[in-house]
């Protein structure tokens, strides 16, 4: 009966965090609008081989993540939940692997359930796992690879070992097809310390080639198909998206070596108090095969991405699955022997909640700031933000009431965040970061436009997805579409600032021309170097400028 209650509680937890509130949040640009539009175009065109964005070739990522996103929009429609359905599904599948792997390692159902809840409630997992990017997919394939390798090495018969390595190769292959060759580097680096400490080199060399074969066979059909359709895809994807992005001096998203330290700290909320003890206990028990394996899958990817020049918080998402297992194991030991870490965790959550309440007041219309984040007419959003932090502090306090029994309620600290964050975003943020908000405000003007031009790829993708059209023209800036715009058949999809006046004269009689520009909050739009317009509609950071036929 207790198991049934636990399952009901888990499903309610998942519904409140990962299902019910998702549609209340508008899509963020540039990431969510980009992936939403790529998948919409894939469904509309029926081309499941070559990814396109705004009708242009888009070679920044392989195809598998777009497949999953497209299935999400096909099943649930072109809406906020449909766009995020794929990442939510991948996150929940990863949580299922956490459950299964924890149960296999320790044979403890309670521990397995706790590891799952800890994983799903980690701030970084929740933030990325409900945000339409490709990282939850690659995290799933990496965690699946972690489980597959363990299965292979624990099998006694050659059939079990062979099956495990074949499965490992498939997961690596799908990882390559999701985000590239990092899906090969991370598993290799993660298993090497465990193989070395356990002296299992023989099994690795005997059966490892099976993983290589299954990986190649997984990637080969699509790899050959896109090479035939677009011969330069692999050159661009390997050199630009891997070497330049991560290793060269001009790498994208450059950051210092210690970049991930604050990411780990913030990402571990509301379980931050368990982080030091989980890592220390894992190291202290490194003679235990399972513990050192989880520790290796936590630390090695973190070191790898720290050494790389290009860094983003999403890159280390896969580290938090083994870390959640270590945290759950340590938490049960602490509850049984010395609950000091659990008390510290409760106080950290109280401090975080109280700090958030104070910070919300400071940036509110009633605070000391001359330019508050929220305006007076957005008072309800301020109260939503206060509710988020109040609930965080409340559940932090509740875990201290009987810490040996109530410590696990820290999983409810982000409940307010899950339910209310979509209602607390300031209008000034929505106007710049949520193209849907802009489209809703300017729908009547945008809909009849013959041509739409914009200077932001993220805004362009948002306009295309909302208006269900992929012919948005880039104005003045090419951004990440630079490579796709170099193709001969992309002529006419970019208009420079110097050419705009002539282009306008040539096309004005064909219908309404709409220019959507991103501007600074205090920028005078009358000073823009553009021909006089027939209509201007400013929505803070985005401006709609229209030219009608003469």
UniProtKB/Swiss-Prot annotation:
Question: Which GO biological-process labels does this protein carry?
Answer: lipid A biosynthetic process; lipopolysaccharide biosynthetic process; protein O-linked glycosylation; response to iron(III) ion
Instruction: List the InterPro entries.
Output: ArnT_tfrase, Glyco_trans_39/83, LipidA_mod_glycosyltrf_83
**Cystine pairings recorded for this chain:** none
Pathway connected to this protein = Lipopolysaccharide metabolism; 4-amino-4-deoxy-beta-L-arabinose-lipid A biosynthesis
GO MF terms here are: 4-amino-4-deoxy-L-arabinose transferase activity; mannosyltransferase activity
Localisation per UniProt entry = Cell inner membrane
- Briefly, what is this protein's role? Catalyzes the transfer of the L-Ara4N moiety of the glycolipid undecaprenyl phosphate-alpha-L-Ara4N to lipid A. The modified arabinose is attached to lipid A and is required for resistance to polymyxin and cationic antimicrobial peptides.
**The name this protein goes by in its record:** Undecaprenyl phosphate-alpha-4-amino-4-deoxy-L-arabinose arabinosyl transferase
Instruction: Tell me what organism the protein belongs to.
Output: Escherichia coli (strain 55989 / EAEC)
Taxonomic lineage of the native organism: Bacteria, Pseudomonadati, Pseudomonadota, Gammaproteobacteria, Enterobacterales
């Amino acid at each position: 009966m207790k198991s049934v209650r636990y399952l009901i509680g888990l499903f309610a937890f998942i519904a409140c965090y990962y299902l019910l509130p998702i549609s209340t949040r508008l899509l963020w640009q540039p990431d969510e609008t980009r992936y939403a539009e790529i998948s919409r175009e894939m469904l509309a065109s029926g081309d499941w081989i070559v990814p396109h964005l705004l009708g242009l070739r888009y070679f920044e990522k392989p195809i598998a993540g777009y497949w999953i996103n497209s299935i999400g929009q096909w099943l649930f429609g072109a809406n906020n939940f449909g766009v995020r359905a794929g990442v939510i599904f991948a996150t929940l599948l990863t949580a299922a692997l956490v459950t299964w792997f924890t149960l296999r390692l320790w044979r403890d159902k309670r521990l397995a359930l706790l590891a799952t809840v800890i994983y799903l409630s980690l701030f970084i997992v929740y933030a990325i796992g409900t945000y339409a990017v490709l990282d939850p997919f690659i995290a799933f394939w990496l965690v699946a690879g972690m489980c597959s390798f363990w299965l292979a090495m624990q099998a006694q018969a050659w059939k079990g070992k062979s099956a495990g390595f074949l499965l490992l190769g498939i997961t690596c292959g799908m990882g390559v097809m999701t985000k590239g060759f990092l899906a090969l580097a991370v598993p290799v680096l993660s298993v090497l310390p465990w193989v070395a400490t356990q002296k299992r080199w023989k099994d690795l060399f005997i059966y490892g080639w099976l993983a290589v074969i299954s990986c190649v066979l997984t990637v080969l059909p699509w790899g050959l198909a896109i090479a035939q359709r677009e011969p330069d895809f692999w050159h661009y994807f390997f050199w630009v998206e891997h070497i330049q992005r991560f290793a060269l001096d001009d790498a994208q998203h450059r950051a210092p070596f210690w970049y991930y330290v604050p990411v780990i700290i913030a990402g571990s909320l509301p379980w931050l108090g368990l982080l030091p003890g989980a890592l220390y206990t894992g190291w202290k028990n490194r003679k235990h095969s399972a513990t050192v394996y989880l520790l290796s899958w936590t630390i090695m990817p973190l070191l790898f991405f720290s050494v790389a020049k290009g860094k983003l918080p999403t890159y280390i998402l896969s580290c938090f699955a083994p870390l959640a297992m270590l945290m759950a194991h340590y938490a049960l030991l602490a509850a049984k022997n010395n609950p000091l870490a659990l008390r510290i965790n409760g106080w950290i959550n109280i401090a975080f909640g109280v700090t958030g309440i104070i910070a919300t007041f400071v940036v509110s219309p009633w605070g000391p700031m001359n330019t508050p984040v929220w305006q007076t007419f957005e008072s309800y959003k301020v109260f939503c933000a206060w509710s988020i932090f109040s609930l965080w502090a409340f559940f932090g306090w509740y875990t201290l009431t009987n810490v040996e029994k109530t410590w696990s309620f820290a999983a409810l600290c982000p409940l307010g965040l899950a339910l209310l964050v979509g209602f607390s975003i300031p209008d000034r943020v929505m106007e710049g970061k949520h193209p849907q908000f802009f489209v809703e405000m300017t729908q009547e003007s945008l809909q009849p436009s013959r041509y739409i031009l914009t200077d932001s790829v993220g805004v362009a993708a948002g306009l295309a997805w909302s208006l269900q059209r992929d012919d948005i023209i880039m104005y003045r800036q090419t951004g990440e579409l630079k490579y796709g715009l170099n193709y001969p058949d992309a002529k006419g999809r970019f208009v420079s600032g110097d050419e705009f006046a002539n282009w306008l004269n040539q096309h004005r009689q064909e219908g309404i021309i709409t220019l959507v520009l991103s501007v600074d909050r205090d920028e005078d739009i009358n000073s823009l170097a553009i021909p006089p317009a027939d209509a201007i509609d400013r929505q803070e950071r985005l401006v709609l400028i229209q030219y009608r036929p003469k």
